[in-house]
A protein has these predicted regions:
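Active-site beta3 strand of CheY-like receiver
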Residues: 44-50
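Two-component/phosphorelay signaling modules centered on CheY-like receiver
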Residues: 11-29
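Alpha4 helix (beta4-alpha4-beta5 surface) of REC/receiver domains from two-component response regulators
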Residues: 62, 83-111
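Conserved phosphotransfer cores of two-component systems
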Residues: 42-44, 66-74, 94
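Receiver (REC) domain active-site loop signature in two-component systems and cognate sites
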Residues: 55
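Acidic catalytic/metal-coordinating carboxylates
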Residues: 33-36, 59-62
Length: 125
């Protein structure tokens, strides 16, 4: 399975994402700030980064910029509780980035992770 960097400043969200990804067999590297996410990316070289857009000290888009300077091909999923036209305009310049709206369901999140990693999804009911 994959090594996945998950960055979110909300401990409850980070715990849930860590739990679900670990249950899927992935190794999770956790970060609670943007700066920590960049540092842990450099140390661990994950196969996927899951980044909250709004974090203290450095938002997910700045983290994405820092990651892209080192690895322009790393798959990235941006997660947010905010949706709207202004957010869409901010992120439309990023190629190869998936988006996940918090609260959309963990099954949907796992499917997006698998799709982004190029792994088969779970069969439906």
């Amino acid at each position: 399975m994959a090594k996945i960097l998950v960055a979110d400043d909300a401990p409850a969200v980070l715990d849930v994402l860590d739990d679900v990804l670990t249950m899927e067999g992935h190794e999770v590297i956790r970060a609670t700030t943007g700066g920590e996410a960049v540092r842990k990316f450099q140390e661990s070289r994950p196969q996927l980064a899951v980044l909250d857009i709004i974090m203290p000290d450095m938002d997910g888009l700045l983290v994405l910029d820092a990651i892209r300077r080192v690895d322009s091909d790393l798959p990235v999923i941006l997660i947010t509780g905010l949706v709207g036209e202004s957010l869409g305009k901010k992120v439309e310049r990023y190629q190869g980035v998936a988006f996940f709206e918090k609260g959309s369901g963990l099954d949907r999140f796992v499917d997006l992770v698998n799709k982004t990693l190029g792994m088969p999804g779970k069969p439906g009911p």
